[in-house]
């Protein structure tokens, strides 16, 4: 079941920044996530994404791993270095293979990883989890929203 954003969270940050060099992916995610009630900005380069992140806060940065100017891992690392308070999620076109290096890395860094072609329910679940974690962390003050969850 795909859960729509609850009306009680409308006053909180519900902005998602999607970074991918593929226009079709950006268009799909914008249309789909906006249909669920999220505010979505799409950007095709990491350089432009950093400019956008300085303008306003996003609770989630959803980034492709393989991009021409900077890969998703380096991009996330730089976001953390700049102390930008956002949750992160990765996307990859490699598809899910439990033996693939990307899956092993994903389990190590503990950021959600969405595999292309996308499963809509998994996208909705990953976004809602990131949203809940972001706002819980801000309220509790226990950790920076840029830090991945330390539990398995």
Where do the PLM segments sit?
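Non-catalytic signal-transmission and effector/linker regions of two-component phosphorelay proteins
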Residues: 1-15, 121-152
């Amino acid at each position: 079941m795909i859960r729509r954003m609850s009306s009680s969270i409308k006053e909180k940050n519900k902005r998602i920044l999607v970074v991918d060099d593929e226009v079709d992916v950006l268009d799909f995610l914008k249309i789909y996530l906006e249909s669920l009630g999220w505010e979505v900005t799409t950007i095709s380069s990491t350089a432009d994404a950093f400019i956008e992140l300085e303008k306003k806060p996003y609770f989630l940065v959803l980034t492709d791993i393989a991009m021409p100017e900077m890969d998703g891992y380096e991009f996330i690392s730089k976001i953390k270095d700049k102390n930008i308070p956002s949750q992160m999620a990765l996307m990859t076109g490699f598809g899910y293979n439990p033996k693939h290096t990307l899956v092993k890395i994903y389990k190590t860094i503990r950021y959600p990883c969405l595999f292309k072609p996308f499963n809509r329910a998994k996208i909705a679940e990953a976004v809602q989890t990131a949203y809940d974690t972001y706002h819980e962390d801000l309220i509790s003050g226990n950790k920076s929203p840029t830090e991945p969850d330390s539990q398995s």
